[in-house]
Amino acid sequence: GVRIFENTPVLDVAPDGDGMLTTCASANIRSDKILMATNAFRGLLPQIRRQVIPVWDYQIATEPLTPEQLDSINWGKNRHALSNEAYMFHYYRMTKDNRITWGGGGAVCYYYGSRTDQGVADDRGRFERLSKEFFETFPQLQGVRFSHRWSGIIASSTRFRMVPGIAFAGRVS
């Protein structure tokens, strides 16, 4: 089984016999392996600091789709989140009220040295590019309007995908 420790600031990780010891402010956790889910600006391990960068990412959400529109994309029966590697990567999911949230793609912006620029938060051109990529994936939804848009800094691997087993002989990912 797996145990998840949310909102647990980690002070240190170190090998401990055949496993790992995670030192936290209020407790120590022993485990076989560690999966670290961290923010873009965290970097406890040098191996992870070199693999994770902050990128400015953009998302849009459609207006609620009709049953006919859902049938046209054959996505109305399940609500699985999806991703693809077109234009670097996209990720998208269906919401409870039948909207598609769509993010990523060529609209991702990185500044060398982990710097950021608040001036790109509401870049109209990046949102337009994201909507163009949406309709290239879902041409049958041409004409659907976007009701929401937002952006923010997220953590991404330098390869734009999960990087497993990067420290302590594969015991930390």
Where are these regions (language model features)?
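Ligand-binding pocket scaffold of soluble enzyme catalytic domains
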Residues: 6, 172-173
